[in-house]
Amino acid sequence: MKVDLFDFELPRERIAEHPASPRDAARMLDLSAADIQDRIVRELPDILRPGDLLISNDTRVIPARLFGKRGEAKVEVTLHKQEGLGTWVAFAKPAKKLRIGETFWVNDEFEAEVLDKKDGGEVVLRFNKSGADLIAALEKYGVMPLPPYIRRETGGDDQDKSDYQTIFAQKDGAVAAPTAGLHFTPELLANLDARGINRRTITLHVGAGTFLPVKVDDTENHKMHSEWGSISPEIADLINETRANGGRVVAVGTTSLRLLESAAREDGVVEPFEAETDIFITPGYKFRAVDMLLTNFHLPRSTLFMLVSAFAGFERMKAAYAHAIENEYRFYSYGDCSLLECASKID
């Protein structure tokens, strides 16, 4: 499909700079029924049914943006994928300032050797720390890798270190938040539990590729960055049991959905999963594992707007986004969300 089909005009003032407070006070455009309804997130338990299963992503965002030097030249890097112990692929700016074999220096105790350079401003860095020591150094010296459309002077501030983390966050490794999870509060989770709605988490370490623009003219020519994900045997069994009993699988965010679909067989059975996925979902895809999706409002021409168009229907999503813009919904990572029902399942 032509990428231009997924374009739309979005006024700059519709882009949220900070999350709603409290988080479950964010607005929610409900498309789970025939009519479009304006709701708020804390109404979610009233819409879902007892026996439904809510699947969230428990990845934790690391402060993956670093400001340092190569010699006297200032360089900024954003880590986006771990390749080995202490070794990460990163986007460097300006990449031309880094040369293979030289040192990217943050301070006297934190530095990395440039192992390789790739296309598109990517470099491979080997740090002088690994494991928990590397995470501790990132927490101390790094800043949150906020999307470029959220404006900050020098990257994420201290408030963003909590704002840009979901209530489900447990496992270090993401460099972008699974933003649909940002809407949940302890009170909302308690209300979901009281309603008899089951909850489990899976893990997909979101990479910075989620922010990359689609530069090709046709979706057939776009290549996704791969991301590592995991679904345990116990959770795979519960997903299959839920659907067999007539319950619905509700994915919290596109990252959860992409991982579930990556783990699903053609007959819809979800299998345990621990691998990389680069699944790219566009209209025409038949969904195997997910019945409903809670997701934020996405960028024009983005792979995520393509995904929701595939999930709920292209024309329906165009109408929904027009409604959201007209009614002043807040867009992107810190913005409001929509609740979608799948319109394109396997037979």
Which residues fall in each region the model found?
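Surface-exposed, charge/polar-rich loops and edge strands
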Residues: 1-347
